[in-house]
Amino acid sequence: MTPEEYLEGQVLLIDKPLKWSSFQAVNKLKYLLINKVGLPKKFKIGHAGTLDPLATGLLLICTGKFTKKISELQGQAKEYTGTFYIGATTPSYDLETEIDQTFPTEHINEVLIHETVKQFLGEIDQKPPIFSAIKKDGVRLYEHARAGESIEIESRKTTIHEFEITRIALPEIDFRVVCSKGTYIRSLAYDFGKAMNSGSHLTVLRRTKIGDYDVKNAIDITLFEESLQ
């Protein structure tokens, strides 16, 4: 692809590696496009929806004039697959922090799991995790969390379009979810465990779709770099 084509606008489908932040992925591509393709240092580039470092999968990175499409792309429904670990919670609702509480699981069976799924379909109220980048009083929630401060987090409306359990091997449950913008799958994991009178946290998360864009058509950053050689 020519520099002009990148400047005119592209949506790059990247399969984000584990432990990379979305910001790191954008910076890596920016570096490659400046140094390997010859784009000007101030060209526009940005992503259309953050993925946590502990998640993998589809990251849409827009270049040039297509950065104007970012807000439109962010509004698209998103599909995720992953794993809940039942019987324990963590402060971050995922593996970023250590287990802080354990809960009974003897009462949990397939019937209860599938009945609980129904509670989360459609529009729901969801509280974001305190380990998140949302701001409260001008300060990001994770900064309050790391300072050990307790803070009241307001719930927000979000929509779960589809929610299915794809494997049950307790204490693990695999799932597939299609949801609206602003949905936290970590919060879904936490709330799901609570709804079963137990606890749960997210151990695996992969974003597979954003609107019509599919991770099957995405490229690994290393392969993208090699394609520019």
Curated annotation (Swiss-Prot):
One MF annotation (Gene Ontology) recorded for this entry: tRNA pseudouridine(55) synthase activity
Its biological purpose: Responsible for synthesis of pseudouridine from uracil-55 in the psi GC loop of transfer RNAs.
* Annotated protein name in UniProt: tRNA pseudouridine synthase B
Q: Which PANTHER family match?
A: PSEUDOURIDYLATE SYNTHASE TRUB1, TRNA-PSEUDOURIDINE SYNTHASE
Q: Name one Pfam family in it.
A: TruB_N
InterPro entries linked to this entry: PsdUridine_synth_cat_dom_sf, PsdUridine_synth_N, tRNA_psdUridine_synth_TruB
Active site: residue positions: 52
Name the EC number(s): 5.4.99.25
Identify the taxonomic lineage of the organism of origin.
Answer: Bacteria, Pseudomonadati, Bacteroidota, Flavobacteriia, Flavobacteriales
Q: Which UniProt keywords apply?
A: Isomerase, tRNA processing
Its UniProt entry gives the catalysed reaction(s) as: uridine(55) in tRNA = pseudouridine(55) in tRNA
Q: To which species is this protein native?
A: Flavobacterium johnsoniae (strain ATCC 17061 / DSM 2064 / JCM 8514 / BCRC 14874 / CCUG 350202 / NBRC 14942 / NCIMB 11054 / UW101)
Domain of life here?
Bacteria
- Cross-referenced NCBIfam families: TruB (TIGR00431)
**Alphabetically, which GO biological process terms does the record hold?**
mRNA pseudouridine synthesis; tRNA pseudouridine synthesis
* Residues in coiled coil: none
Instruction: Name the family.
Output: Belongs to the pseudouridine synthase TruB family. Type 1 subfamily.
